[in-house]
Regions:
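N-terminal edge beta-strand
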Residues: 1-10, 117-144
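Extended, well-structured beta-strand/loop surface patches
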Residues: 21, 27-77, 85-100, 114
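Solvent-exposed, low-complexity, repeat-rich "mucin-like" stalks and linkers
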Residues: 24-28, 131-157
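A glycine-anchored, Pro-Gly-centered beta-turn/N-cap motif
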Residues: 76-80, 202
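Short, exposed beta-strand-loop hairpins at the edges of beta-sheets
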Residues: 83-87, 111, 209-219
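Beta-sandwich strand segments
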Residues: 92-97, 215-221
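Short, solvent-exposed loop/linker segments at beta-strand-coil boundaries, enriched for Pro/Gly
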Residues: 152-154, 159-180
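Glycine-centered tight-turn and secondary-structure capping sites
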Residues: 196-204
């Protein structure tokens, strides 16, 4: 079992999970399939249990967990475990939910762990629902911004606020993932993914706009938020 911990988040937050193969591959080079995901609280009670049928290749899988109950109310402060079941065993992440004011007192963190070239990455997740939000991360935390859109229309999301001394470093180029659909069908929407890592203390603002890059018109959508790294 590969375990990451402890990832600290404020009440009501969302996390994203990826299993990434490091190259060049030295072992476990065959495809790895995700078969399920579960969320368990500190007393061992299962809050969420999701099975994938059919199973999903880790190359295409992106797990999302919202730390809210069935009524969309934030889960209580405390320790939780996210377990990801795969064809080669279990990956897990220990998560501590705290009040927002406690985030600044938490220490540095490494938001990944690996075995035999397979790395589990944990991200604080933001979407268009977080427009106007202000959140706190620790140095070493990862952030994923996932924005719905449709690349087949020519529209794309882009962060228009570029700073000289960034406290969050973009770790990969923007990725677009279309929703699963039959190969012969076109025009399906999907999600634009942006990945960052908190590398220094300070604050940084983000302004994502959804538009066609060649058009000189107002963006169709705007999502803004700020991040403080403690």
């Amino acid at each position: 079992m590969v375990s990451v911990g402890t990832f600290v988040i404020e009440k009501g937050a969302r996390l994203a999970f990826e299993i990434v193969r490091q190259e060049p591959c030295t072992c476990l080079c065959d495809p790895v399939w995700v078969t399920g995901l579960s969320l368990v609280d500190g007393s061992g009670e299962t809050i969420r249990d999701e099975a994938y049928d059919p199973s999903v290749d880790t190359v295409e899988w992106l797990g999302r967990v919202a730390f809210v109950d069935d009524a969309e109310e934030p889960l209580s402060e405390g320790l939780y475990t996210v377990s990801i079941q795969t064809s080669i065993g279990e990956f897990s992440a220990c998560v501590e939910v705290v009040a927002s004011q406690r985030m600044a007192r938490m220490g540095r963190f490494s938001a990944s762990a690996s075995v035999c070239g397979l790395e589990l990455r944990v991200y604080r997740l933001l979407t268009d629902e977080d427009d106007g939000a202000s959140l706190t991360l620790r140095q070493g935390d990862r952030l994923m911004v996932a924005l719905a859109g449709n690349a087949t229309t020519g529209f794309e999301w882009a962060n228009t606020l570029l700073v000289e001394y960034a406290v969050l470093r973009e770790t990969e180029q923007m990725e677009y993932r279309a929703k699963p659909h039959p190969a012969e069908m076109v025009g399906f929407g999907g999600t634009f993914l942006f990945r960052y890592e908190a590398i220094a203390q300070g604050s940084q603002a983000f302004r994502f706009v959804y538009r066609r890059p060649w058009e000189s018109v107002q963006p169709k959508e705007i999502v803004e938020f700020s991040v403080h790294v403690s």
